């Protein structure tokens, strides 16, 4: 069985960071709110931590869409602020995730991604995202304005549509293929996939 990792981040513009040394992130559960009176209590009043039945609906969907299939995923707890489930309670974000054993590929904009499997195996795309989530990936010889937007994400099914079920596959990382989620920003394509033997029906 794949061990489950847990990351907990107290509220207040802190960075919630998930990462996998081997494989890619697969989010299992996510809580934004408060379910106990032990987590993130330093310097807080009893009133701020007494409500232990507070959770934001849909937090797990946000984490899955932003983090599944990536090696590293960072987001601010502030993204949940507009839909605060309990305004008087001091909250935290807690995510449980596994590191799913997949092949992880990054392709800079205008380059071509090559997905391939051993003979007899076919590609099964786990996740794909075209955009920019940090300042460092695909940043060589780029001016700062082209890599400044880190919150540019465009999960896409186009890689799965083009490549799933094939032994090998090429797809260009370009706005023509995926559209442009953030104009003027130099983007990259992240793909996580596994190779498997075709299921015999």
Swiss-Prot record:
The keyword Disulfide bond applies. Pfam families: SUEL_Lectin (PF02140). Gene3D superfamilies: 2.60.120.740. GO terms for molecular function: carbohydrate binding. Keywords: Disulfide bond, Glycoprotein, Hemagglutinin, Lectin, Repeat. The keyword Disulfide bond applies. Residues 18-100, 107-196 form the SUEL-type lectin domain. Disulfide bonds join 10-40, 20-99, 54-86, 67-73, 108-138, 117-195, 152-182, 163-169. Homodimer; non-covalently linked. Rhamnose-binding lectin. Also binds melibiose, raffinose, D-galactose, L-arabinose, D-fucose, maltose and D-glucose with decreasing affinity. Does not bind D-arabinose, L-fucose, lactose, xylose or 2-deoxy-D-galactose. Shows strong hemagglutinating activity against rabbit erythrocytes. This is L-rhamnose-binding lectin SML.
């Amino acid at each position: 069985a794949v061990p489950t990792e847990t990351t907990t981040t107290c509220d207040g513009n802190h960075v919630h960071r998930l990462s996998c040394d081997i494989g890619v992130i697969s989010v299992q559960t996510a809580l934004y709110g408060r379910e106990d009176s032990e987590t993130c209590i330093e310097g807080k009043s009893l009133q701020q931590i007494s409500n232990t039945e507070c959770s934001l609906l849909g937090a797990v969907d946000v984490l899955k869409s932003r983090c599944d299939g990536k090696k590293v995923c960072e987001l601010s707890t502030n993204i949940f602020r507009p839909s605060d489930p309990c305004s008087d309670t001091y909250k935290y974000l807690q995510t449980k995730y596994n590191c799913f054993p997949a092949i992880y590929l990054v392709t800079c904009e205008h380059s071509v991604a090559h997905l391939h499997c051993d003979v007899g195996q076919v590609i099964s795309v786990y996740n794909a995202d075209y955009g920019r989530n940090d300042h460092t990936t695909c940043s060589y010889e780029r001016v700062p304005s082209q890599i400044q937007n880190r919150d540019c994400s465009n999960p896409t099914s186009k890689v799965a549509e083009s490549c799933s079920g094939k032994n090998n596959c090429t797809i260009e990382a370009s706005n023509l293929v995926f559209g442009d989620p953030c104009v003027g920003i130099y983007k990259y394509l992240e793909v996580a996939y596994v190779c498997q033997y075709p299921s015999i029906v």
